[in-house]
Amino acid sequence: MASSEFIDPAKLDLDDQVVAINRITKVVKGGRRMRFAALVIVGDRKGHVGFGTGKAQEVPEAIRKAQAAAEKNLITVPIVGTTIPHEVIGVYGGGKIMLKPAVEGSGVAAGGAVRNVMDLAGVADVTSKRLGSNTPVNVVRATFEGLKQLKNAEEVAKLRGVSVDHLAE
């Protein structure tokens, strides 16, 4: 299972990717008040990935806040070779993401935010389908819900109380 135990971001060489920046307008008595919201994904391309959101009056500050939030929200993704261990569906709100393992060399068949998550997680071969909501925040959250459900063969064998060899039969 993709563990959500605390992962120290200082020990990892993290890259980041800004997925979305939204301008938010609040109408007040004196006119319109503008703010910005940023969605950022961070990862080390070796099985650790996280996402975060940040809001501020200026875009760079919103991105900085989102990066800090993403580093606090890291998960570990089990990777088998260059792909994920099994098919999974992640759901968050109206967003649904189906992730399927792919043969080596097929690449990341995913669009937008899902591709960014997979690249930063270090998954080189995967197929995905986005169902339902396609807003970037829902897509990223649904992708993370799916990644959290992943288990490798050792974890499944341990949960069932059998050997890994017995699972392959």
Curated annotation (Swiss-Prot):
SUPFAM superfamilies: dsRNA-binding domain-like (SSF54768), Ribosomal protein S5 domain 2-like (SSF54211). It comes from the Bacteria. It holds the Pfam family Ribosomal_S5. The keyword Ribonucleoprotein applies. One of its GO terms (cellular component) is small ribosomal subunit. GO terms for molecular function: rRNA binding; structural constituent of ribosome. Signal peptide: none annotated. Gene3D superfamilies: 3.30.160.20, 3.30.230.10. Residues 14-77 form the S5 DRBM domain. InterPro entries: Ribosomal_Su5_D2-typ_SF, Ribosomal_uS5, Ribosomal_uS5_bac-type, Ribosomal_uS5_C, Ribosomal_uS5_N, Ribosomal_uS5_N_CS, Ribsml_uS5_D2-typ_fold_subgr. The keyword Ribonucleoprotein applies. Coiled coil: none annotated. GO terms for biological process: translation. Keywords: Ribonucleoprotein, Ribosomal protein, RNA-binding, rRNA-binding. With S4 and S12 plays an important role in translational accuracy. Belongs to the universal ribosomal protein uS5 family. NCBIfam families: rpsE_bact. Part of the 30S ribosomal subunit. Contacts proteins S4 and S8. The N-terminal domain interacts with the head of the 30S subunit; the C-terminal domain interacts with the body and contacts protein S4. The interaction surface between S4 and S5 is involved in control of translational fidelity. This is Small ribosomal subunit protein uS5. The gene is rpsE.
